[in-house]
Amino acid sequence: MSDHQVEQLLHTTEGWFSAAYLSLQTLAERGTLPDGGSDIYTMFSAAMIQPLSLRRQAFLAMLGLADEFTEEMAQAVTEYADAASQIADLTARNAFVTRLPDGVTYRFHHMMKECAQRTFRTLPPESQQRCRRRYGQWYEERGQYLQALRAYGGAEDFDGVLRVVEKDAGILLALLPPEQVLSWLDRCLPEVLERHPLAMLVLMRSMFNWRRIPEMLRLKEQLLAAIDARPDMSGEERGNLRGECDLIMSFLLYNDIAGMSRLHRSASAQMSRPAVSIRRQGGWTFGSPSVLMMFHRQAGRLDCELAEMDECMPHYYCVTNGHGQGAEHIMRGEAAFLRGQLDDARIALAGAYAQIRDNGQENMALCCDHLAWRLSLCTGETPRQDFDQRRRELLFQHNAAWLNILNSTDAYYHALIGETESIPEVFREHRLASVRYLAPGKPMMELIENQVYLAQGAYAEVIGRSQQLLAVCDAMHYALVAMHVQLQTAGACEMLGRRAEARGLLEQVLQDAAADGLVMPVVENYRYLAPLLADMPQRGDVPHMIELGRRYEARCASVRQRSAVPMAFHVLTPRERDIAMLVAARLSNREIAEKLYLSEGSVKQYVNRIYAKLFIEGDTRTKRKRLVEMTQH
């Protein structure tokens, strides 16, 4: 091979050619290839890192802590004034250091990264801590709080950890394992913790989210003691901290709307500023896609709960700068939907969307989306964005919690219409254990997973899970979630021919539903309950439920038919499929643009991308003819 070919192979294989070379070198030296017990990383370090100067080795070791880095970052975290030339030399000589397409960011191949980290662990402990602290400062200054927390934690710099906890207000902190945060607190000196009362408030709320109530109460006592131990603290700041403590403690009365509101009013009376530990851009529903599922706690009290919500939310908004704004409108819209009052639901939904527009509260927008998708199966109105569009939009926000909520809505919708292959993988393959859900929102995820099991025909699984799920709902006063689980279980029993059990469950649900005028939970499960409902006494809302159920199933069938696309179109996104079908129906670009509210230029770009994905070539007439043929197959 020529030198050029060797270099090309090296870069094309992202360095794996070097790994093959190292194996062959072992064969030449020892007469055997490395076996399964050989450490390729030790071989790599011996060949690629140890021959370097100690200064270059230290440079690589420190950069090994970063997933990606720029020249500016490299200089900051290594304190090498010549970092740019060091990187340029490494990139030119080594395929294991790659410049990314943006032209400014670099990345180590994972073999180089692993070996660099091993080398880092050989540096003096104080050097390691200083380097990690520099990483923490770099990430903190750029708002990359998750990375900053890990860096400061690794450096045992708990002032840094607590400072970032305060700035983050628990938003990204929720993505860390609680055990890691508790480990930091165990190693943090009390006097360091007491220097950061606002961080203590954030940690109290995080402990509630993780259901670590004893730790939450212990932090409260430490906070109050720290306030009392500061005679120099102004009365105003004492009031702010004590008021915010009341605000956080209100979560212990979670979903007791009136009880929570009493503490919100106490907080409002003491505070002269909005809460620092709760930010508008943070989550409000603990990952639940539904507000009503969180706060409907007792059959027959729905109207009281709606009135309490209307009364209490303004007090909460006052002390949190509008956190969760629109929640009462969403809850009222959901209640109207469940009562079959579709126009009222649409009006409330439009009001909620208008209230939260451009205020940065993505959690509430996602709750609106959840209601919009459920409504669409009754009204035929298409939500503002399809799931793929919404997912792409959320990806730019780098918040896994928002994607989890979207996935739950996506899963529930496709389970309702019976399109199980379109359900997001985490629900379709039942991998919820791999996702870190906050405790108050987890029962809603379990409910949705149950709906997926039902759609997949896994009836025994639904029945087997029900007792544990209902026990959790009872403990958390989740009356609406329990109603859905009972209906799912009744449907599963009916499908397995266990009519007596199904009937007993359905009779209980009908009694509870009648107390609040709820019909849609039954309608959403009509596919499984139809024979049983027909056999029930035709009184109360049962005839109305049957009528709505028939219409609902007809609309679901229509949605399934519309979404049925040729096999070849499965490589296209949903939007591309829609456009491809319109092109095949011989609509012009202008007509498609008007129908889908796009510009003609956008339609043209979509069409070109469709042809490229489907490998359709030729002039315009030939391409359209081929597309029509594909739809007919």
Q: What name fits each language-model region?
A:
Residues Y41-R121, R130-R133:
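C-terminal boundary/linker of central alpha/beta nucleotide-binding cores
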Residues L146-Q147, D157-F158, H196, M233-G243, ...:
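Alpha-solenoid helical repeat architecture
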